């Protein structure tokens, strides 16, 4: 099956819109509204692959991909709090000895600093093996502006590493949140 980078700088590879072309030229991440932060030693500009096509499906590779229009946060707020009102989201909240929560969502009383409830949010995306091949596909696209969807760049998805790291975090962070009687949402 074909394997290739399918979304670069926030736009599917087939998207030839002015917005897509501008994002690629400026290396702009529309999900974070800033320059793409991903690096590769194989290119002199940000490694803007958000998603890869493999095994007939799209796999998100960048956690910022989940930030599109705040949809994840709205869904979690509606699911957990029943509303999107009086919500604040903080990123990279430190927990000494454990690590950081990707995000903490706080529901506060209206027009108040009193916290009613909070949840932690963790984002987990795919990781690749033979990433140099994915970079090769990215470079080909950036040079030509197109891809052949039948082409295979021989990278892989390291599912074992994803779940190994995620499981460790679930244990460590889950113990703390269980003591606090709070929930954690995993976006995978």
Question: Predicted regions span which residues?
Answer:
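A general structural motif
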Residues: 116-117, 181
């Amino acid at each position: 099956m074909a394997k290739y980078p399918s979304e670069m700088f926030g736009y599917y590879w087939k998207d030839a819109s002015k917005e897509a072309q501008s994002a690629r030229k400026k290396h702009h991440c529309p999900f974070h509204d800033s320059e793409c932060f991903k690096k590769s030693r194989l290119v002199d500009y940000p490694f803007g692959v958000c998603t890869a096509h493999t095994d007939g499906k799209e796999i998100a590779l960048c956690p910022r991909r989940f930030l599109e229009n705040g949809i994840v946060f709205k869904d979690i707020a509606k699911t957990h709090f029943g509303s999107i009102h009086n919500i604040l989201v903080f990123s990279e909240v430190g927990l000494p000895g454990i690590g950081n929560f990707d995000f903490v969502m706080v529901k506060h009383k209206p027009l108040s600093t009193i916290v009613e409830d909070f949840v932690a949010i963790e984002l987990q995306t795919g990781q690749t093996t033979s990433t140099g091949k994915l970079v090769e596909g990215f470079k080909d696209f950036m040079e030509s502006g197109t891809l052949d969807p039948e082409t295979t760049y021989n990278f892989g998805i390291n599912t074992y590493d994803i779940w190994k790291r995620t499981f460790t975090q679930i244990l460590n962070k889950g113990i703390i949140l269980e003591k606090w009687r709070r929930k954690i949402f995993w976006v995978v």
